[in-house]
From Swiss-Prot:
Name used for this protein in its record: o-succinylbenzoate synthase
Keyword Magnesium: yes
Annotated Gene3D superfamilies: Enolase-like C-terminal domain, Enolase-like, N-terminal domain
Molecular function terms from GO: magnesium ion binding; O-succinylbenzoate synthase activity
EC number: 4.2.1.113
Upper lineage: Bacteria, Pseudomonadati, Pseudomonadota, Gammaproteobacteria, Enterobacterales
Metal-binding is among the record's keywords: yes
Database matches in InterPro entries: Enolase-like_C_sf, Enolase-like_N, Enolase_C-like, Mandelate_racemase_C, OSB_synthase_MenC1, OSBS_N
Role according to the record: Converts 2-succinyl-6-hydroxy-2,4-cyclohexadiene-1-carboxylate (SHCHC) to 2-succinylbenzoate (OSB).
Assigned keywords, A-Z: Lyase, Magnesium, Menaquinone biosynthesis, Metal-binding
Cofactor names: a divalent metal cation
Length: 320
């Protein structure tokens, strides 16, 4: 016997969260809980404003229609990426095919003060990997901050993300302030420039490896080995079903590229599932999941070690 519930939720964000020049005051999304006999599976559907093609209102309509079809015996996945991902997670939990083992080691995220990151990294066991958002301030400032971090922590490897913010000139201004001897410790810089060709040129001219992120979701993208390209960053909420995520990871690994499972600022429930997906598909790579502290609460499932208050499912708005 099948049953299902759908919940709508909204989490207040910290004041300083800006996405694509837009302040994100709340994180809005949906949960689906599928039950069959004694088993149940959960999934999160939370399109990311400014990045997802769909709004959460669009996602809600598609999800409710899919749930009704599933209750009637139809299991075909929806095409909308955020819904396909959430539903496929719920189905995988229901079928017990999503492993429980999780990689909760997140690369800490630096949005502002480099001193905060230095303190975080001092207590980090093992390989020191951190992520720094660049492109929000002047490129020269970004270069100086990155250089400072690499100089202060000799065993640090940095992942940088520019979200296509730079012109070729700004990319050169950034690189000018990063010591040549430190550049090999930049694990990769995600999408430095507005076009892929400009990003490729940046990698050739600076010796700084790049990674594809937004490019993966463009219709003309193909997985090929290219000089200067070291990694792909896979955001499942923006990608689609678990099968599609796995296909992309396998395509990257076949070319010798690093595949990084990365957050789209999901709630704690979604983040714990991403940690399980990372342990399953990319066991040797620290995922990019250090976004929970951008929120003011956890929901339904706790992230280990987080001190944020937990909102129980009973406090959420039930739609079905």
């Amino acid at each position: 016997m099948r049953s299902a519930q759908v919940y709508r939720w909204q989490i207040p964000m910290d004041a300083g969260v800006v996405l694509r020049d837009r302040r994100l005051k709340t994180r809005d999304g949906l949960y689906v809980c599928l039950r069959e006999g004694e088993r149940e599976g959960w999934g999160e559907i939370s399109p990311l404003p400014g990045f997802s093609q769909e709004t959460w209102e669009d996602a809600q309509s598609v999800l409710l229609a899919w749930v009704n079809n599933w209750l009637a015996g139809d299991c075909e996945l929806p095409q909308m990426p955020s819904v396909a991902f959430g539903v496929s997670c719920a189905l995988a939990e229901l079928a017990e095919t999503l492993p429980q083992a999780a990689n909760y080691r997140a690369a800490p995220l630096c949005n502002g003060d480099p001193d905060d990151l230095i303190l975080k990294l001092a207590d980090m066991p093992g390989e020191k990997v951190a992520k720094v958002k660049v492109g929000l301030y002047e490129a020269v400032r970004d270069g100086m901050v990155v250089n400072l971090l690499l100089e202060a922590i000799p065993d640090l490897h940095l992942r940088l993300d520019a979200n296509r913010a730079w012109t070729p000139l700004k990319g050169q201004q950034f690189a000018k302030y990063v010591n040549l001897d430190y550049r090999h410790r930049i694990a990769f810089l995600e999408e430095p420039c507005k076009t892929r060709d400009d990003s490729r040129a940046f990698a050739r001219e600076t010796g700084i490896a790049i990674a594809w992120d937004e490019s993966l979701r463009e219709p003309d993208f193909a997985f090929v080995a290219e000089e200067g390209v070291r990694a792909v960053v896979i955001k499942p909420t923006l990608t689609g079903s678990l099968d599609k995520v796995r296909e992309q990871v396998q395509a990257a690994h076949a070319l010798g590229l690093t595949a990084v499972i990365s957050s789209s600022i999901e709630s704690s429930l979604g983040l714990t599932q991403l940690a399980r997906i990372a342990a399953w598909l990319t066991p040797d790579t620290i995922p990019g999941l250090d976004t929970l502290d951008l929120m003011q609460a956890q929901q339904v499932r706790r992230w280990p070690g987080s001190l944020l208050p937990l909102v129980d499912v009973d406090a959420l708005e039930q739609l079905l």
